[in-house]
Amino acid sequence: MPTSHENALQQRCQQIVTSPVLSPEQKRHFLALEAENNLPYPQLPAEARRALDEGVICDMFEGHAPYKPRYVLPDYARFLANGSEWLELEGAKDLDDALSLLTILYHHVPSVTSMPVYLGQLDALLQPYVRILTQDEIDVRIKRFWRYLDRTLPDAFMHANIGPSDSPITRAILRADAELKQVSPNLTFIYDPEITPDDLLLEVAKNICECSKPHIANGPVHDKIFTKGGYGIVSCYNSLPLAGGGSTLVRLNLKAIAERSESLDDFFTRTLPHYCQQQIAIIDARCEFLYQQSHFFENSFLVKEGLINPERFVPMFGMYGLAEAVNLLCEKEGIAARYGKEAAANEVGYRISAQLAEFVANTPVKYGWQKRAMLHAQSGISSDIGTTPGARLPYGDEPDPITHLQTVAPHHAYYYSGISDILTLDETIKRNPQALVQLCLGAFKAGMREFTANVSGNDLVRVTGYMVRLSDLEKYRAEGSRTNTTWLGEEAARNTRILERQPRVISHEQQMRFSQ
């Protein structure tokens, strides 16, 4: 007789295969996740297991048997130059070759979403192969390439980088993105005041007004951590080493930790250190399975051909729910202050970020770049209820954009593997994109690592790091979607009422289970 567990598994699988809104490829993806999550979890200490079961720590539904890294950032330049013995490909000689080679390799780059989350620093990669092509000839090819990416790899966690330099490829990508207004690929422009021309940054601002992309990264800040050109911005704004990536992402629910604390002092001296240690134990267990039991790094041609290096993968030490944690702790101390409203509460938040950063910097991990994890302000997942993503301000009553940026900026110094705050601006900004440029430059001057904006009235909007069309959400439940992340946006709309709020959307990363 089938056990209750077997019956539950069959019911979940039956729900997937009979779903009227999933494509066959999407059904296959979710069925594979159910199979993986039916396997035993890597062995954990009792306290770490309890924290995971109680929801104080969340493993992002990555799966019980991590047989591939969460995020992979291949050295695409090496691939274009040398080709691949495994794929029986010669190196590229012109732009057509380069685009063709990339479209082939993308299908062999694994990730937590089963699609590539990093497409490369595309303008730097492709510009050497332009040769004698005119701008019009480049534009035609890039637009065709852009459409191909969205139609064959329909996952909005897929992420391309451009900048900081100007080039015909850079301009062609910006034009294609503004014209096509696609959900994927996502796009980050890396800004460097010593390199980026003013008119290029203005063009980037115009694109944001048009399609809420690209996200803008503060290049010099990232260069200090990874070296110039030694990193990529992927998925939901995770900054990671190039030719490596992110092995796993586990996150602390700071709200739940605050609920288990008797006072502010108890939080900082007992509960937060305790759960930080449990999170490291989970990270180590997951990475040990990936490195020692999955055989991924032993068998992948990406390793054998020098496109990735196992020593350049880093686990991400995530957190979320800072706003709720601060408010709870202030209540316990009798402090009449709210996060994002009063300086006393904001200072508690900064202290939490500083203590997390100190812990991560001083705590070795078994497997990882420089033997350390990297701190990440995680942007939430679609099923989160009652918590604010990362270190963001609570939704619904945010201050004006300048005050908002000044409030969150101090956190950015601590989160080396990514932190983001989404500003939603009135659509009147479209008449003055230079104001958007000044807002971005002011944010970077204040110390922010990233600048991200949605423009009210646009159909294409950002849900944390990835994009969805609001029009797609309305028809998804009836018709389904060819884009793998539309259902996430739809679930976020139900769970968080994002469509009922002022022009601003919640952020979340991939939820690794299907629910109708």
From Swiss-Prot:
Family from the record: To H.influenzae HI_0521.
Name of the featured protein: Uncharacterized protein YjjI
GO BP terms, alphabetized: anaerobic respiration
Transmembrane region(s): none
NCBIfam families: glycyl_YjjI (TIGR04040)
Pfam families cross-referenced by the UniProt entry: YjjI-like
Gene: yjjI
Organism listed in the record: Escherichia coli (strain K12)
